[in-house]
Regions:
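Conserved alpha-helical substructure of the radical SAM core
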Residues: 86-115, 282
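Positions that flank functional sites
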Residues: 97, 123-124, 298-299
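Auxiliary Fe-S-binding modules of radical SAM enzymes
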Residues: 1-36, 205-314
Length: 314
């Protein structure tokens, strides 16, 4: 990892992007520093929903003491089925400046978390990276986990080299049709491939662990959607074709219908065991070497952000 002074120009350049915002592929080009709002509805603020030790991530991320997870408000995708819809579809939480966010990061260190995990960081990148570097100057020595939706601008990801230690991107859609239908982002597959390629270039296509705890690398996540199994299979095909079958995959079964889709012909139900096993077996047949899988009990990981503690840890 480089020194803080090395990254100062990168942080300044990220802040400049906010003047005509192209942090994500939607490229709204609004002046967020002047209070203009684009798709994410964020101006020049960081809005924090919750910060807590998270015990429900992949085992090398959560470990025994939890990931130091900061849930950020808003999103550049706003999927119709979003499991975090309470904070992604609206601006919900506390407006937080860089210094206070740095203190939140240090409080998670003091809670003995294994890392600092940023959830939905994309619209907030300039300020949260500045806060993380500030926390490092104040003594932080933990890996940074970038947990994103996969709809990223590769040029922005390039600027995070040496700051982010572990990338945890979603790869939601393998087809433009499904990406447009469910997220209004027809170009999602192309941008997911390009941005994850840049992540791999930075940290490799494996997960480096010490005593079972992730220190560097990446895991690609995919949430299986009921009735969209062909989409899942196409995601796996794209990963193998454009990335590598050695990259760790987290294939998730925890989909829970939210109120907005309760009457949807497919999304209004949970996935079946047969659907999940179909996708897992396809991944194995394609030669993927490192797969994190879930059992049906993990569906309880769906949060309720209206509560002070959004998860019910067993």
């Amino acid at each position: 990892m480089g020194t803080n002074s090395e990254f100062s120009p990168e942080i300044d350049q990220l802040k400049e992007i906010l003047i005509s915002c192209v942090l994500c592929p939607r490229k709204c080009k609004v002046n967020r520093r002047a209070g203009e709002l684009g798709f994410c509805r964020l101006a020049d603020d960081v809005v924090v929903s919750h910060a807590l030790p998270h015990y429900g991530e992949e085992p090398p991320i959560s470990g025994t003491r939890g990931a130091g997870t900061i849930f950020l408000s808003s999103c550049n995708l706003k999927c119709t089925f979003c499991q975090n819809y309470q904070i992604s579809h609206s601006i919900s939480g506390t407006v937080t400046d860089v210094e206070d966010l740095s203190s939140i990061i240090l409080s998670l260190r003091d809670a003995h978390c294994h890392n600092i995990e940023l959830v939905t960081p994309t619209p907030h990148v300039p300020h949260i990276m500045e806060a993380f570097l500030m926390a490092q100057r104040r003594g932080l020595n933990l890996p940074l986990v970038y947990n994103c939706g996969g709809y990223e601008n590769p040029e922005v990801i390039h600027r995070l080299k040496g700051i982010v230690d572990i990338y945890l991107p979603d790869f939601k859609y393998g087809t433009e049709k499904d990406a447009l239908l469910l997220s209004g982002a027809k170009d999602y597959p192309r941008h997911a491939i390009d941005s994850i390629k840049e992540m791999v270039r930075q940290v490799g296509d494996t997960l480096e662990e010490y005593e079972g705890i992730a220190k560097r690398g990446m895991v690609i996540r995919h949430l299986i959607l009921p009735g969209f199994i062909r989409n899942s299979l196409e995601v796996l095909r794209l990963i193998k074709t454009h990335l590598s079958p050695s990259v760790p995959l987290s294939i998730m079964s925890q989909y829970t219908p939210i109120p907005a889709v309760k009457n949807h012909p497919h999304l209004g139900r949970r996935i079946t065991r047969a659907e999940y096993e179909h996708v897992i077996n396809y991944a194995l047949d394609m030669g993927f070497e490192n797969i994190f899988s879930q059992d049906e009990n993990d569906r309880a990981l769906t949060p309720d952000f209206e509560k002070k503690m959004p998860f019910n840890w067993a």
